[in-house]
Regions:
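Walker A/P-loop-proximal flanking segment of P-loop NTPase domains
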Residues: 1-48, 52-61, 65-71
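Conserved P-loop NTPase "ATPase switch" module shared by AAA+ and STAND
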Residues: 141-167
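Structural recognition of the conserved hydrophobic beta-strand(s) that form the central parallel beta-sheet
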Residues: 146-150, 171, 175, 188-195
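Amphipathic alpha-helical segments of the small helical/lid subdomains adjacent to P-loop NTPase cores
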Residues: 202-206, 213-291
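Extended alpha-helical interface modules used as scaffolds for assembling large macromolecular complexes
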Residues: 281-396
């Protein structure tokens, strides 16, 4: 069976387009906020396409509509091009010390400024991140810059159990965001993504005026695949999967519709908006399934994904015997946990049992099942998460 578009192995927008790979077009949603200035923050679990979103924004602001004419935003976007400072904070999250972290942050920022074609004649690479950024921004008069930060939370999450290092990194990052705020007049647009919301912390109070799109029902499908998108962009892969699965099982059990239902139970039913308007599938799991399903069942990578996240470390520090039993009961019986919307993104300066369900939500282990008068009911989204989370909780 031939496919009009290949499945992408990269999160880079330009590579996806140039290689004629499947790109799920959400640019109409991008148009709804990218014409504004921000700053915006957007939180979603790992694997939901945040890096592709950042890459799409980078290409849009740097190149205009050059690579977007055939996409939905092609008829909506009228803006000019800009210099883009694009940072990925996950690139220096594993620093061995505060000084190493600061030096790695400097290198990442210096490279990003250079890639944005900004003049670096008067700056030194060994300046602190805040000083380095300030020296560049003070010489810019108009709103000619776009700032994009991917995985902003990665350096803090990596040391969440080490209070001393967490506090040191938090201070460095807080100074950086204070600089961004001080020079907000030079930015045309600021957009920041991550998994865990640390901006609720008093340490980041200098940047707490950013608009959070995470719970906004208008952007519930900004990350993740809806069922309509699965049908639209992956229909040939669904049909091929049916043929392979029927061959493997020596039956005609799988049809287009019931495979969709199976995928929803295993990889879908995530909801992150406060009106329960949009339900989405995990993109990385869907692409993995279709990529690996050839002549045998794909190996599951869900458990590995959980182990590679901060969840393992977090649970080891907060799970008492009673809370562990309570959580396992919720997993086994499918019991929902009610949480005030205001508590979904609490102040996270340290690990506590009080933050357990909020962290589980932010990392994608729980999602919104119902919403009423500011109270959100949280539950396990699907079978894969249920199995992986149960195994993880039992092991810690």
């Amino acid at each position: 069976m031939e496919f009009p578009k290949e499945l992408s192995k990269t999160s880079t927008f330009r590579d996806i387009i140039d290689n004629n790979c499947v790109y799920v077009d959400k640019t109409d949603l991008i148009a709804k906020f990218a014409y504004l200035k921000g700053p915006f923050v957007f939180f979603r679990p790992r694997g939901f396409g945040k890096s592709t979103l950042i890459s799409s924004l980078q290409d849009l602001f740097e190149m205009g509509l050059d690579n977007f004419h055939s996409l939905k935003i092609g008829r909506l976007w009228k803006d000019k091009t800009y210099k883009v400072i694009k940072l990925d904070f996950s690139s220096f999250k594993e620093s061995s010390s505060t000084e190493d972290f600061k030096a790695s942050f400097n290198r990442e920022l210096f490279t990003a400024l250079k890639n944005a074609n900004l003049s670096l004649n008067k700056v030194q690479e060994n300046d602190g991140p805040s000083d380095l950024l300030s020296e560049i921004l003070m010489n810019i008069d108009s709103t000619d810059l776009v700032l994009l930060i991917d995985n902003y939370d990665a350096p803090l999450t990596a040391v969440l159990a080490d209070k001393t290092e967490f506090t040191s990194r938090q201070k460095i990052l807080s100074n950086f965001y204070s600089t961004v705020k001080s020079y907000q007049g030079v930015f045309r647009f600021v957009f920041i993504t991550g998994e865990i919301n640390y901006f609720s912390s008093s340490t980041f109070s200098s940047f707490n005026l950013s608009e959070d799109l995470s719970l906004n029902s208008d952007f519930g499908a900004l990350a993740g695949f809806t069922e309509d998108e699965l049908e639209c962009y992956f229909s040939p892969y669904i049909d091929r999967a049916c043929k392979i699965l029927n061959k493997l099982n020596k039956s005609n059990k799988y049809t287009h519709d019931n495979l969709l239902s199976t995928l929803k139970r295993k990889y879908g039913d995530y909801c992150f908006d406060n009106k329960c308007k949009e339900h989405v599938y995990n993109p990385s799991f869907i692409v993995h399934f279709f990529s690996e399903l050839k002549e045998e069942h794909p190996n599951s990578h869900i458990s590995e994904s959980f182990r590679n996240s901060s969840l393992d470390n977090f649970l080891r520090h907060v799970l008492s015997k009673d809370i562990k039993e309570q959580l396992l009961k919720c997993i086994d019986l499918g019991i929902s946990i009610d949480l005030a919307q205001s508590n979904l993104y609490p102040q996270l300066d340290m690990l506590t049992e009080r933050n357990l369900y909020a962290i589980l939500y932010q990392l994608g282990n729980l999602c919104i099942k119902a919403s009423r008068k500011g109270i959100l009911s949280l539950g396990i989204p699907n079978l894969e998460v249920k199995q992986a989370l149960k195994e993880l909780v039992k092991d810690v």
